[in-house]
Amino acid sequence: MQSQLKACGDAPAPSCSLHHRRTISKKPSNGGNSGGGGGGVNSAYLATDVTTLDINAMFQSKKMKRHGAGVTAPSTPANYLGASAGAGQANPAHFNFPSYLNPASFYPNVDLLGGSSEHLPPLMSVPAYKPTSMLHGFSDAASAMDFAQLTEELNALQNLSASFPNSTPNAFQSLFATDSPSSFLTSSAVSSHLAKPSPLTANSVRGAGGRKNRMVEVKMINERPVVIVSDPQAASASARSQIVHLNRNVLGVLKGLEASKKRSISAEPLYSRKVFIGGLPIDVTEEEVWATFGWFGKVLVDWPRRPEHGGRGDFYEMDMGRRNSRSVSGYVFLVFQDEKAVQELVNACELYENKYYLQLSSPTMADKAVQVRAWRLSDIDYFCDENASVDHRRTVFIGGVPRPTRASDLAYCLQQHYGKVSYVGIDIDPELKYPKGAARVTFATAQSFVRAISGRFVQVTHADTNKRVEIKPYVMEDQHCDECQGKLCKHNYAPYFCGDSSCLQYYCEACWDRMHYAMCDNRADHRPMVRTGDQTRILPRPPHHSTSHYHHRSTPSHHHNHTHQNVTSSLLEHAPHLQNTSIISRIVNRNNQNNNSANSTPPQMKQFSAIPTAIGY
């Protein structure tokens, strides 16, 4: 034991450390090579890696030893902390915990207790701590274990259905029993015992834990049912076709097929080729879906693509390849190549409470009833009276409509709130004829149309769905200005539509400024709606107004007022019937106005198509 002078007082320190470190037997002198600041060659801090945590732990340990005179633990065995700890104490029952249980004791190349407090180095000159390798016996870093490669091998064992051809005790002992550390679970050692799965097994088609969209069809080869699986995005046909043997027969589907053959198949299309399958078990496999629905014909299995579970997809991708971030939602879409296959599928289902169900199994559930929701083509349109005329100027657009909603159901909901409806059309995909989640509704009267625009929302209820959707004006293309009938814009089509309930008209640039800034100050905050392709956009300001000259909720200058007064007087001379007319009367009499203006329209009109791409705010 030796006595060392510290800033906090004298405290005895053992000359033998826990890890057999070499201690400093003599303090470096200020006049020697130490340089007076602990920076000499004899300083213990130059040849070691010391951090602020080590220095603080040293002083805390010294302080506890000075005030507590050592913390003892009764009946502590000699081998509790190893042989070296027992050798350093004559009596193991009086083991000095502060001397050994401190962070500084875990550094194998420095004895901090042997240093002097007046020779502490500057913090900026202390190098960062570099931990040594935990694997003893490696001579260099290249021979150490590659944990990244080990993780890949373990994931391969989980994700892939690897089979061990030599699955004997000797084979496994040769795999894991190694003589040298460098050969511990290396890539060559594991790969030699991993056999690639057969292409005829079902798991070979599944790739790295993700469900892929596949075109499948069940056929009979040598009196055995097999599934022909193909990748629709593959470059060549030979590279995308695989054969998967069925391990068992789907009895529920076979019984349904026998029952469907007894029912007639319509020659006219009755359903969309796209079918929704809901209520799937969470652990259902791709092969079970293929084997269940592939009997009805060639079908594309389209799994949902949106991410689920808030970014936890990586966890599900490692779960034996059955679930991932985009295929755990419990439903799937089927796109059949022939519409008659959909009719056979519906005929094979069981009807319960106006819903169709089919049995499907999973590793944890046997013969679960899943819902088969086919879209009827007769539910696309609804006409209140087929002989009545439909005024498209009284049409509204409704987005976010639930896909199972029929046109008649939507018409019933709107008539309960706003008035009589003459037509409802569900927007569908032109190829598959499947709903896109939007609809167009035409009201029978102008009062109902204005009431629906003012209400803005409607509650759509169908079966188990109950959703609140928004009502917007339906903007059409190739429409003339409702104020000037094209007289002030050289008979060009009107670029803007005002969707506010006080306007609901198409405007040219001149009439927009006159009606929103010159005649009414309370219309200055109205935003124009423009039609671009199949979409309708609401712009923050008219594009013909530059950003520097556009003032929100402000009236034009005196020069602009004089210009608008001239435009107003010229407009009233050409169309005196537009003065002091209400919005309802303008909508009701619009057909007559369009017929009168069509006679004075030149045969050649320039179509409006110049909508600015970049619009400043």
Curated annotation (Swiss-Prot):
Keyword Repeat part of the UniProt annotation: yes
The RRM domain, residue ranges: 273-377, 394-465
GO MF: mRNA 3'-UTR binding; mRNA regulatory element binding translation repressor activity; ribosome binding; translation factor activity, RNA binding
GO biological process, alphabetically ordered: cell differentiation; negative regulation of cytoplasmic translation; spermatogenesis
Keyword RNA-binding: yes
SUPFAM superfamilies, per the entry: RNA-binding domain, RBD
GO CC term, one of those recorded: cytoplasm
Underlying gene: cpb-1
Compositionally biased spans, kind Basic residues: 542-563
Protein name: Cytoplasmic polyadenylation element-binding protein 1
Subunit composition and interactions: Interacts with fbf-1.
Annotated stretches, region: Disordered: 1-38, 534-568, 592-617
A Pfam cross-reference name: RRM_7
Role: Cytoplasmic polyadenylation element binding protein that binds to and regulates the translation of specific mRNAs. Essential for progression through meiosis. Involved in spermatogenesis.
UniProt KW keywords: Developmental protein, Differentiation, Repeat, RNA-binding, Spermatogenesis
CDD domains in alphabetical order: Bbox1, RRM1_CPEB2_like, RRM2_CPEB2_like
Organism: Caenorhabditis japonica
